[in-house]
Amino acid sequence: DIETARNTEKDDMLNLIRSRFESGSSTLSLLKELYPDNIVYVNRSGNYVFADINPKLAASEYDKSAFARNDKGLMTYSGTNAKTYTGIDLSKHNSDVDFAKVKAAGVDFAMIRCGYRAYGSGLLVEDTSFNTYTTNAIKNNIDVGVYFYSQALNKEEAIEEANYVLTLVKPYNITYPIAIDVEAIENDSFRQENLSASELTDVIIAFCDTIKAAGYTPLIYSNLLYFMDNVELERLEGYDKWFAGYQTASPYYPYKYAMWQYTSTGSINGVSGN
């Protein structure tokens, strides 16, 4: 009868929850599994959010079941609807990099930090490894894109950042996108922390349009929390996304993206550190 069916469904659900926790699943990963039609995340206040998927935004084109790690630990995609490439994200924190070994390890491209705006002083700073990394990557037939960590407060500062980046990349053959990196500074205050979603979106658009006008492909780097809470995604539909999402077998992001950063602790021959 109906009551028996309800009790059976309840027992099945409780058994699922118990088995997931016994196997080490986190509360968040379990909630994501239980609510497949929502975007589940934890906001900056520490509260769980169950957001509806926005039908106005282009959906991801990738088959989640087609993602897998190969014998080298690198993420691969076997879907027939796209050809994928393996890349690494580098900054001065990686110290010495042997790009010949990196190329031999199967890396197709490198996203290299060219600089940043200091989150306290607001000064524009070049990454001290940018020139060396870029020169040696290109020398070893690794395609290069760049990213810049933004702390712009308005359109004018965003354009200033973009023009600074264009000056830095001018000597090089940059074949991959130029990304604006927007994310929070953990455990410290930072210039952009009080910007509204509308204001930060203005910053991103101003940066991207300046990059695009110079003949490069703009890209927006961020994580799930920032894409959901800190920008107006509908206004950013015309720009490619570089999604950072870790500890999942496939990207936990329902919307269209061009690049996925799937770990912050990866290792590859030729690079010291993560």
Annotated model-derived regions:
Residues 9-10, 102, 230-231:
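Compositionally biased, low-hydrophobicity segments enriched in charged and small polar residues
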Residues 45, 53, 168-178, 182-274:
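Surface-exposed substrate-engagement region within the catalytic domains
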Residues 4-8:
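Mixed-charge, low-complexity intrinsically disordered regions
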Residues 74-75, 97, 227-230:
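A generic local structural motif
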Residues 80-204, 212-214:
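Substrate-binding cleft of extracellular glycoside hydrolase catalytic domains
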Residues 1-2, 211:
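Gram-positive cell-envelope targeting signals
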Residues 12-87, 94, 234-274:
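Functionally critical loop-and-helix segments that line ligand-binding/catalytic clefts
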